[in-house]
C-alpha cells in the first residue's frame, strides 16, 4: 500500500486496497497521511489521538475539501453507518479490556 496503517478493513469483499483504515496517532502521522490514502482511494480513515476519534470520508468533489486532501471530517461512519461511534469511543477509553468488550457487546445488542 505504500503506507502501513495500524488496522485496515475491506467491507463486503476483498479488494486491492481497503475501504477503511485506522491510525493510532502517538507521535507522528495523522492528517497528513490523508494525502497518501486519497491517492489509493481509501474511502474512510479513522484517527485515534488523545482519547478522541476523528473520522474522514473521501469525497468525489476533491476541490471542495482541499484542506484535508479530499476528505471531509464527519461524525458518523459512512462505511459502517450502523456503528455507534460514542459507544465505540467509550469502550476504547475503558481501562479494562474485558469490561470494555462486555459494555460494547451489550451496547450493540
Describe the role of every protein-language-model region:
Residues 1-40, 46-109:
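C-terminal interaction segment
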Amino acid at each position: 500500500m505504500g503506507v502501513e496503517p495500524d488496522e485496515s478493513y475491506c467491507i463486503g469483499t476483498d479488494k486491492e486496497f481497503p475501504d477503511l483504515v485506522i491510525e493510532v496517532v502517538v507521535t507522528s502521522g495523522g492528517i497528513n497521511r490523508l494525502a497518501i490514502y486519497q491517492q489509493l482511494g481509501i474511502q474512510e480513515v479513522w484517527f485515534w489521538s488523545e482519547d478522541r476519534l476523528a473520522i474522514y470520508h473521501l469525497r468525489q468533489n476533491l476541490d471542495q475539501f482541499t484542506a484535508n486532501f479530499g476528505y471531509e471530517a464527519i461524525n458518523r461512519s459512512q462505511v459502517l453507518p450502523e456503528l455507534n461511534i460514542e459507544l465505540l469511543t467509550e469502550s476504547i477509553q475503558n481501562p479494562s479490556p474485558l469490561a470494555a468488550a462486555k459494555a460494547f457487546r451489550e451496547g450493540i445488542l
